[in-house]
A protein has these predicted regions:
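Mobile cap/lid helix-loop segments that gate and shape the active-site cleft of serine hydrolases
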Residues: 48, 205, 209-242
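Catalytic nucleophile-loop/oxyanion-hole region of alpha/beta-hydrolase
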Residues: 99-104, 108, 120-158, 295-302
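N-terminal cap/lid segment of alpha/beta-hydrolase-fold proteins
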Residues: 35-81
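Primarily recognizes the serine-hydrolase "nucleophile elbow" in alpha/beta-hydrolase
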Residues: 145-214
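C-terminal catalytic histidine-bearing segment of alpha/beta-hydrolase fold enzymes
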Residues: 267-316
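Short beta-strand/loop motif that positions the catalytic acidic residue
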Residues: 246, 251-254, 258
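Conserved alpha/beta-hydrolase "acid-adjacent" motif
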Residues: 259-268
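Short beta-strand element of the alpha/beta-hydrolase
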Residues: 82-93, 97
Length: 316
């Protein structure tokens, strides 16, 4: 009798958990459908239209040679539990862009905030006339270190920190997450803090710099990446060269028709990761370009659902 009672309680609990997860999915789907009249316009929104209700804007997290670096922090103040942290790292080819969260993923950010996440949209020093991968990676790692330093002030759950970034932001995020705590040290005041994260969402990031189609990217990238230097850059700053055991869980999303970052490089990254028993997941898009042009409504929903399911499952 007691065994049956215990089994019944377990079944009820499982049912409740599934119900909660499904309610989150439906809420997310509703938010996505509100995004615009057509999800096919997602590519044009990917670098514009900031989301509303910023909780803390322009927090200075470090100084680089006199230049202040800032991020925006979004928090649902009504939730008092320790907050999982998701850090958004923008793309734009390392040479331009800012921390404004694009409208295309604002529904994801709004949902996560509503579910109790602390969302950070960080910035990093942009390349001008020289390659500064070291600084950019240290900026991402220093954002993570800042979270550890301020965990009590903002009630962060530092056991549940994730990174999400498109393109160049994904490359910087992967190296920041795959490298050790004592690598890519920037601000000395943050040096003593860890840079460990639990998971990463890699949105079509270049995992092997030697295979990027530079001619299809911004002219500033071509100017910075000379033929003489590309080999050394590739060895030092390609995420594929940081693959080892016990890496953070990683969701890789890439299109077969990416015209700048070859799809096969993400396949290679995925295979290298799972070969060493890392938890790497892969979601393939069929027809869109690197800038998500030609992304169908169906694929957009699949893209969003995979991201949100992955983040929620990692943050239990």
């Amino acid at each position: 009798m007691r065994k049956k009672r215990t089994l019944f309680i377990i079944i009820i609990l499982i049912t409740l958990i599934i119900g909660v997860l499904n309610s989150i999915r439906f809420k997310f789907l509703y938010e996505v459908l509100k995004l615009s009249n057509s999800l096919a316009t997602i590519s044009s929104d990917f670098y514009s239209e900031p989301i509303k209700d910023i909780t803390y804007k322009d927090i200075i997290y470090k100084r680089n040679d006199g230049e202040t670096l800032k991020f925006d922090l979004y928090i649902n103040g009504e939730i008092k539990d320790p907050k999982p942290v998701i850090i958004y790292v923008f793309g734009n080819g390392w040479v331009y862009g800012d921390k404004v969260i694009p409208e295309a993923i604002s529904s994801i950010i709004d949902l996560l905030k509503d579910e109790g996440f602390a969302v950070i949209s960080t910035s990093y020093e942009l390349m001008d006339d020289e390659v500064i991968f070291d600084k950019q990676i240290s900026d991402v790692k220093d954002t993570i270190r800042w979270v550890y330093k301020n965990k009590d002030k903002y009630n962060f759950d530092v056991d549940n920190i994730g990174l999400i970034g498109p393109s160049a932001g994904a490359q910087l995020s992967m190296i920041a997450a795959f490298s050790d705590d004592d690598e890519f040290v920037g601000d000395v005041s943050l040096k003593e803090y860890p840079s460990k994260v639990k998971y990463i969402v890699d949105l079509f990031g270049p995992s092997d710099l030697s295979k990027i189609n530079l001619s299809a990217g911004p002219s500033e990238i071509v100017d910075n990446f000379t033929a003489e230097d590309i080999e050394s850059y590739s060895k030092l700053y390609s995420p594929i060269n940081y693959i080892k055991e016990d890496l953070p869980d990683t969701l890789i999303i890439h299109s077969k028709k990416d015209n700048i970052v070859p799809y096969d490089t993400s396949v290679e990254l995925y295979e290298s990761g799972i070969e060493l028993n890392n938890k790497f997941d892969f979601y393939t898009l069929e027809n869109c370009t690197h800038y998500l042009e030609n992304l169908s409504n169906k694929e957009a929903l699949g893209l969003y659902m995979n991201i949100i399911d992955f983040i929620l499952s990692e943050s239990k």
